[in-house]
Amino acid sequence: MITLTDSAIAAIKFALSQTCEPADGLRIKVEAGGCSGFKYHLGLDSESRDGDAVIEAGGVKVYVDSASQPHVSGMTVDFTTGVDSAGFIFDNPNARENCACGKSFG
């Protein structure tokens, strides 16, 4: 369903190691919004919920709710760092268009 690059796995592991809240994975949710129609919402989570797809890769879990699953099927998640920014990058084959910021799609 979702592929994580080694960089994304390392970033998720780092985030999990820094949180004070109990968490063992990353939740990816697609919500209405952004300049192209949909946006990604990311957050750490401690458990799966009814209907979730649970993807395990490199020792981390990714939770995707049932409503978001069709929007992220086949997506690759990467993490990049630059001189002045760092963040997750989404290569989503379901996106017909992306906004300039790369966080919103339609």
UniProtKB/Swiss-Prot annotation:
UniProt cross-references to PROSITE patterns, sorted A to Z: HESB
UniProt xrefs under Gene3D superfamilies: HesB-like domain (2.60.300.12)
Record InterPro entries: FeS_biogenesis, FeS_cluster_insertion, FeS_cluster_insertion_CS, HesB-like_dom_sf
Superkingdom, taxonomy of origin: Bacteria
Keywords: Plasmid
The keyword Zinc appears for this protein: no
GO MF terms held by the record: 2 iron, 2 sulfur cluster binding; 4 iron, 4 sulfur cluster binding; iron ion binding
The keyword Magnesium appears for this protein: no
One Pfam assignment: Fe-S_biosyn
GO BP annotations, alphabetical order: iron-sulfur cluster assembly
Family indicated by similarity: Belongs to the HesB/IscA family.
Protein name: Uncharacterized protein y4vC
Species this protein is from: Sinorhizobium fredii (strain NBRC 101917 / NGR234)
